[in-house]
Amino acid sequence: SSGMYGQLNMLIKNIFNSAEESKVIKENPSKTICARGGKPAKRREALTDEQTAILLDSIRELPPYVFVMIGLYAGLRREEILGLKWDCVFLDEKTPYISVRRAWHVEGGEPVVNTLLKTPAAKRDVPIPKCLVACLKEAREKSESEYVISNSKGTVLTETQFVRVWKYITVRSTAERCYYTYVNGQSIKHRIKPRLGEHQPNNPKLVYTMDFKVTPHMLRHTYITNLIYKGVDPKTVQYLAGHENSKTTMDIYAKVKYNKLEELSSVVNAAFGLR
């Protein structure tokens, strides 16, 4: 991101400036490095309450349902959900919670689950609401695996298997898609734009119910956004989200809390004692 680029740029220049002043090097090679660079950070989008309800109704009883529920109501990262085992899910406690202690990784093309989390702050205990408790209790009764999310063999999902699971969501969206036909050895590209409420031609039971995009990270961003909307303080949000850097939390907080002109106006007037 551009923010990371700026930090690295400053660090590199400080190192070479010190080296030049100490006569370690004759000339500072970092003088010509541009101060601007990096890619702008992607704008994070959260699902609305209506979109959340549509998503859950669309995939109820389907493979991605439990994954989506954990993302929406516990805010775990994709790798934390895929690496989650039942021994870290405490549903019968007075205050039910998920203990984040493991993460899913791909090494040499194979899935690996270990205790290597994204940051030290990712190790956390997340209390979970009643709707997620009920969902996980039902999933636990049906499960024969040590993993909360597993394949038909009871083992951890591979990257390819996760993509297949997520496809249950993408095929129900109205996003434009392409397919190819081959005529006389020539590849011809076709575009189709499904309409909301229509049935898929090759599968009449499948209905296009979502006119919005959903990604795994959007579930987590929705969780964080909802905490902020409900007035949860930034430090608590930071802990629950497992953010190592408070800046990450505060950036989201500022965008969510003060993204409407009328809200900004009331804050400014209150600060200066105006009505």
Where do the protein language model's features map onto the residues?
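N-terminal core-binding DNA-recognition domain of tyrosine site-specific recombinases/integrases
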Residues: 1-24, 41, 155-161, 179, ...
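Basic, Lys/Arg- and aromatic-enriched nucleic-acid-binding interface segment
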Residues: 2, 6-10, 21, 25-84, ...
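Key DNA-contacting residues within the recognition helix of helix-turn-helix
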Residues: 6, 13, 82, 225, ...
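C-terminal secondary-structure termini that scaffold catalytic or DNA-interacting sites
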Residues: 93, 108-123, 130-132, 152-153, ...
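Short functional hotspots where side chains directly engage DNA or cofactors
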Residues: 95-100, 149, 215, 226, ...
